[in-house]
Amino acid sequence: MMATDYYIVGNLRKDYEESYSKLGHRWKDYAQRKYDIIDKVQKDGLLLVGINPSFDESFKGSCEGEVRDSENGGYRHPYFTKPKKLNEEIGISDFSHVDMFSLRSRPQHVVQDIVNDPDSQGFVEEQLRLFRMIVDGASPRAIVVVNALASHLIRTGRALGALDYDDVLGVAMYKIGEKRVPVFYSGMLSGAHTIDNGSFDRLIWHIKYVLNMQSVFF
């Protein structure tokens, strides 16, 4: 049995830490929270993409940067329950999830505001560069984007550059070398605005269909 291979996200912690010096001054309180990243993601598996880690907004003051242990509580938050179920249904890899931004905030509009802030573009571009490094390093078999803003940044080409669209399979394709990686856009899988069960089942079917067709014809 082959050993599981991983891309080590934790090796980028210094780059993540340094990126906060490029965050606009109005966001200094968020800069003090520093980064929150997962330690690793599985290569050649299913990669789920969110927008940013949550945070207990009642906490005040600075934090230490955190590299969460994926095998020991790194995915313990209830948010990951439905994404884990999706991963189990697809069944091609261990659970792997990465956020596009490492900034800690519960209200997601904060990330949207930072993306739109002219004084924070250095931070945004550096975070997206690191995100691309993770995706390219993991070289997943499929990407599932489970956040509207993350989907927008990918669809518009800002996060991963221009994607091709496969009209036959009905999915966008991201190229890593010669490898064509299907990108599926989904609504939230957890929380107040989660997709309904029918849409969830359809997502599972579509992912399985595309992966099966790729294995047959590519």
PLM region spans:
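Low-complexity, serine/threonine/proline-enriched polar segments
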Residues: R68-H109
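Glycine-rich, phosphate-binding/catalytic loops in enzymes
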Residues: C63-R68, I114, A159-L163
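A structural signal for short, well-ordered beta-strand segments and their strand-loop junctions
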Residues: L46-G50, G91-M100, A142-N147, Y185
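Charged, often glycine-rich, active-site loop that binds/positions anionic groups
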Residues: M100-E126
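Short, solvent-exposed loop/turn segments at secondary-structure junctions
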Residues: N52-D56, F101-S105, A148-H152, M188-A192
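Proline-aspartate-enriched helix->loop->beta-strand connector
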Residues: F131-A148
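C-terminal capping/extension of enzyme domains
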Residues: M1-K14, S21, D117-R129, H152-F218
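Active-site and ligand/interface coordination hotspots across diverse enzymes
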Residues: M1-Y75, Y79-K85, Q127-L130, I134, ...
